[in-house]
Amino acid sequence: MKTRSTSSRHFALLGAFALASGCQTLAPTEKMADFNQLYASGNYQAAADSALQSAGGLSTEKQPELLWSLQAGTALTASGQFALSNQVFDAAEVLAKEEDTEHLVRKGFEKLTSTLVNNNLNRYSPTVYDGVMVNTYKALNSMFLADAQNARIEFNRAADRQRRAEEHFRSKIQAQKEKLSEEQVKAEAPAPANGYQPNRAEAEQTVYQAYPELQEWQVYPDFVNPYTDYLHGLYFMLGSSDKDDLGKARDSLRRVAGMNPNSPAVKTDLQVVNNLIRGTWRKQKLNPAVWVIFENGLGPEIEELLVPIPLFLVNDKIEYSQLALPKLKLRDQAYSHLELFAGNKSLGKTEQLASLDRVVQTEFKKEFPYKVTEAVISTIAKGAIQYEARRQGGLAGALAAGVYQAATTRADKRIWSALPKEVQVARIRPPANRKLTIKSPGLAEPLEVELPDSQFSIVYVKASAPGSQPIYQIAGY
């Protein structure tokens, strides 16, 4: 027989879970909102400082937080601190590797907390595209530092991550299946007569009705990121030392051309690399060229969607039942495109090369069934706690358990929010006086760019929000 003191201890434990969930959810959300505001306004240095502080700084005595390291590294690239950005991204890679090989005890603990509380108590789990973009940004940083050796290493790593993405994702999904299998067996176990017996299948059907956009998304095949592939191809074309390098460039540019069949820049680059491989053209004899790479806007955020589960799907003795799931919220372009001029002469404009929205949607859609299963199992477990609390503590117990479930039903809204919405590209001939003017509809002040005296130049432009002043960096070849 349960005593009143035992029930009180149980209620206190529920309260502790609810309090822990609230503390773990509210403070990071406020910090992320502050970071996003600084970053969107183009105040990249302040955004980097904020993210570094949230990550735990650069001290080797304390392990930084992975997501904040990703945010900080991106802001440092935008602010021109390329060496420091690579240092932060190096730490992020170490953390991501530890996450992939985490100890079984921690995995067991995180399985418990995701079921009884929510995933916000657990460490950030990096996506496949996180890893690809880390190496992509490290390669970009190295290009701006004129560090050809490390740029080559990082582009090779980025390409290797993309090749292994499907295998990595299968492993990740298998781990998720194993994580959920035990709870699923418990949840589907026969209940005693008149006991707690939820309808999991109908609960999941209710969830999918709240996500009609999943069927409309035009995802990329096989986790390909056209931005990474294009930079990889461009780098190995411009920095080629032999035909093996040119072969790498051609393979990457072919993939990008398959996804962007009407892109003038990609068509021209693929034509050039094919002629270089055949030996009909020589790199030293190519016409000078400028590539303008435009990181435009901001990628998706995650918002929380609460999906009410009708009580008849659960049990008439359950006071509260709903699921909390992540939902992608797309953000705006900063500008529709960039217009490029030599004085008053138009040289062309940028066009879309890659949609990072689609990159994120591709992985989100692939993982979504497992997120739903995890959320449903968590709700079933919490519903069982409610049922037992009502059986042992009456209405007061049921209400206490209902408060616990309401407080702990929270979606994991963590995402690398500093990524761009899309990437655009233009390939032009350099102005004779090496002075490039960049304009855009809605841009108050044009950018005046002094190009280096080199055969090839890459101008990297970034604008995060409508009306913000773009920044730019230059690499010459």
Residue ranges and their predicted role:
Residues 22-43:
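Bacterial Sec signal peptide processing site at the extreme N-terminus
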Residues 369, 382-477:
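C-terminal soluble interaction/assembly domains
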Residues 103-116, 180-210, 273, 285, ...:
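Glycine- and small hydrophobic-rich membrane-insertion segments that are intrinsically disordered
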Residues 41, 79, 145, 239-243:
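Structural motif corresponding to the intra-repeat A-B loop/turn of tetratricopeptide repeats
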Residues 51-52, 89, 96, 155, ...:
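Inward-facing hydrophobic residues that define packing positions of alpha-helical scaffold repeats
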